[in-house]
A protein has these predicted regions:
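Extracellular beta-rich repeat passengers
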Residues: 1-89, 93-344, 350-358
């Protein structure tokens, strides 16, 4: 939890609101469960090579425990190489903030893979979502809200940027009617150079169209140069991009170089039999269709669409997905080391072990 700006009002109805993190009663007095402030450069530390497994809980409606909850975390924080595996709610949820992330993998989670709320405005690259392919267990790839509560006019709007995502849905046996995205409530984000495939529902459902239009008077909402494949119909034909066809307000969603084409990934098996390979063919659409350029020091310039190149799988060697044998060769079994004492000095941990925090 951090101290960057939310688009929720404080008790006086003014900016720089604070919130209690989900999973605790709103009457909880401790600052340890409170997030929000006025420092977008807030530093909440470093998370790198972290695997979060078999967690989460749905306590009540709109009161859940996500795999990773980021409340008002600022851009001074480092978050990269994160896996959330088989969580019973969202994989990750951003509640406002400005934190930048890279190499995020949301695997087999039972609600959304990536959830955005309360005016999140970070930069992101190399996001991977893989959803369950059995029954009614996984929702949208991304549920992206600009804000919450009754007042949808509060700023800042959610002007998040995502480059190089790969979202693989549940396929023809996945959850009924759940598509790639659910956008609503002043969302004004962007996706570029990404691959979205294997979802039963629409590519995009749009709610609260009046608030979406208000947040996007400058055309900030943009889905540019992405690949869409096997969305809804599963017969090789292009599916409708939006559920309610707001073409006038949202031309940037359906235009700007979006392509309906097979990215020819190496494999999408969810059986743990070595048949999963999210890398695209170098001779396919991921390498041979127009791309958005990147600028600034955060983004890594690459010549492909999606979260993976044709050669490298950045989940190999450390992720639970790899350890369970989903890729072509299972990773070496690591030793579990239980950590029960407080860590008060600089400590070096080995990649040969799994460290279990007690």
């Amino acid at each position: 939890l951090g101290n960057s700006i939310l688009n929720t009002a404080n008790a006086d109805g003014k900016d720089f609101g604070e919130f209690k993190v989900e999973g605790f009663p709103t009457s909880t007095a401790s600052d340890l469960v409170t997030y929000g402030g006025n420092n977008d450069d807030d530093d909440s530390g470093i998370l790198r090579y972290v695997s979060i497994r078999y967690g989460g809980s749905v306590l009540t409606d709109n009161n859940e425990i996500n795999g990773l909850t980021l409340g008002a975390v600022g851009r001074g924080t480092t978050i990269e190489y994160i896996e959330v595996f088989n969580n019973s709610d969202d994989g990750v949820e951003f509640f406002g903030g400005t934190v930048d992330t890279k190499y995020m993998a949301m695997i087999f989670n039972e609600d959304e893979s990536f959830d955005i709320d309360q005016g999140y405005r970070g930069r992101n690259q190399f996001w991977f979502a893989l959803q369950k392919d059995v029954g009614e267990l996984s929702d949208f790839g991304g549920e992206h809200d600009g804000g919450d509560g009754d007042d949808k006019t509060l700023e800042p709007f959610a002007r998040v940027q995502v480059y190089n995502a790969t979202y693989i849905g549940g396929g023809p046996d996945g959850k009924t009617g759940k598509g790639v995205f659910n956008l609503k409530d002043n969302f004004a984000g962007q996706y570029h150079n990404s691959v979205f495939m294997d979802f039963r529902g629409y590519a995009m459902a749009i709610g609260g169209e009046s608030t979406i239009a208000r947040a996007n008077t400058a055309g900030d909402l943009s889905f540019e140069n992405n690949i869409w494949y096997d969305i809804g119909s599963y017969d090789g034909t292009a599916a409708s991009l939006t559920a309610n066809g707001l073409a006038e307000e949202l031309a940037n969603v359906s235009e700007k170089g979006n392509t309906y084409a097979n990215p020819f990934l190496g494999g999408t098996s969810r059986l743990g039999n070595g048949g999963l390979d999210p890398r695209p063919s170098a001779s396919g659409a991921a390498y041979n269709t127009p791309m958005s350029s990147v600028s600034g020091g955060f983004y890594t310039p690459v010549n492909y669409k999606g979260a993976f190149s044709s050669e490298e799988n950045w989940l190999k060697g450390w992720s639970h997905l790899d350890q369970l044998g989903y890729f072509d060769e299972p990773a070496a079994v690591k030793t579990d080391v239980e950590v029960v004492a407080d860590i008060t000095t600089d400590t070096t941990w080995s990649n040969d072990n799994n460290y279990l925090l007690g």
